[in-house]
Amino acid sequence: EESEGFLKNTRSFAKVLDCCLNAQRTGLALSLCLGDRGKILKDAHDLVLKHNESIKKLSSQLFREKWRFYDNKETVFINGEGILDIQNVYSFISFLEKSVSFADRLICLRILDSEEFYKFIIIKTKFCNINLIGIAQKISKIFDEEYVKIINNNKIEINISVSNLEDFLSNIKKIIIYEKISQS
C-alpha cells in the first residue's frame, strides 16, 4: 500500500478490518483481504471516517457528563444508559480497550439492554491484573448464573433486571474490591 494511505501498515489495516467487522460488513473486510481496491477502498475509508466520528461523539457525550463516569485509578465505571446501545457498544468497548488512558484499568460499562434488563459489561484491559473469571464466578453465586456470560478471559457480560440494579451495583463493587485484595 501507499505509505501515506490509510492502509499504510498492519495496525491501520487491522483497524479497518475491525471497523468492517463491528459494522457487520464482512464482505467489505473480505474484499480488502483479497486485494480488491478502488470502490472497496473508498467504502472502507468512508466506514472508518464514520466510525471515528461516531466514537468521538459517543466519548464526548459520555465524558462530558461527569456523573456517568467514575475512575478510582484501578476500575472505571461508565454509565452508558441513553447514549450507548447494543449497536454501538462493542465499537466503543474496542476503543476503550485500545486507549492508553485505560490500559491498566478494569472497565465496567452499563447500558440499557431492554425495558427489563441492563447489560453490564466488564472488560479487563491489557495491563490490568485482576482475575475476571473469579469475578464472574462470584457474581454467578450471588445472582442467577444464567445471566452471567463469560465472553473470554478479558470480558464478561451480565444481564441484570431493572429491579435488581441497585443491589447488583452495591455487590459488584464489593466483589471487585475482594478480588483485588485476594490477589495481593
Put a short name on every predicted segment:
Residues E1-L132, Q137-Q183:
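Hydrophobic helix-and-loop "lid/oligomerization" segment in the mid-to-C-terminal part
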